[in-house]
Amino acid sequence: MSAAELPPVVVLMGPTASGKSQLAIELANALDGEIVSVDSSLVYRGMDIGTAKPTPTERAAVPHHLIDVLDPSEVFSTGRFRDEALALIADITARGRLPVLAGGTMLYFNALLRGLAELPSADPDLRREIETRAARDGWHALHAELARIDPPAAARIHPNDPQRLQRALEVFYLTGRTLSDLCEGSRSPELPFRPLRIVLAPSSRAVLAERIAERFRRMLEEGFLEEVEALYRRGDLNETLPSIRAVGYRQAWGYLQGDYGFDTFVERAIIATRQFAKRQCTWLRKETEATWLETGTPGLSDRAAKEVRARL
């Protein structure tokens, strides 16, 4: 089958607070589609306000997938995302509908569109050794070690992200090659679909920065801190879990632990979200084949639907 004959899939990418979720709903309505979330935080139940999760009404109007599939105590790997997304794409297409992939987790998009590197399996003994060193010296010391071994990976991985930090060190110890080298050398897979790429982004960083601040203040008014308090009171969650490391949640957790005051929490959360958006925008610059649309443009959904129809 030639590339032109492959079933089409809308791939809607953009930084946080750019309006992707609303545009995805409008596209799905216009094109008889179903939405597949490409967001590492929307998979968690009980994390609604801080993730800007589509409302029950919105999800009832348009089918959404990969939302509310895990408890916050669980881990959702990139490999699992890829497997489940491919299965959903096949199912939606088989039912004669159009898959609309929408989100901002660029690692997931990259894994789906460009494939996963072939990495060694986890080594329990080595992991225990790394965890013992972390308990003795702290994860920041291990992050400094990773920075010497694999600077690009260290730049991507936060010192307070033990899961990814441990994996990067484990891969190097097992193979003698850095995670960055192995990922760079991975081959692009033959996709079973034809991606129709769309990038939605505000006109400038200043506009995006203001949208982020406004949205976070609105989340606070809607009860975001109370949402995190409910997670905090459970007693079985901690800041090393991927769910609690999500932007905004991590800063709220620190406030609830008494690490800093409310004003500092708000400031840190907004700054962290802006930094996250900057990393997303850097990644999106690679999407030279995508149709770029500006957030807030009059007639945005009509234009996006027209672009997709022209390429179906």
Swiss-Prot record:
Binding residues annotated for substrate, in chain numbering: T16, A17, S18, G19, K20, S21
Q: Tell me the residue numbers annotated for binding ATP.
A: G14, P15, T16, A17, S18, G19, K20, S21
Q: Which SUPFAM superfamilies match?
A: P-loop containing nucleoside triphosphate hydrolases (SSF52540)
| Assembly mode | Monomer.
Q: Which UniProt keywords apply?
A: ATP-binding, Magnesium, Nucleotide-binding, Transferase, tRNA processing
Q: Give a yes or no for keyword tRNA processing in this entry.
A: yes
Under what name is this protein listed? Answer: tRNA dimethylallyltransferase
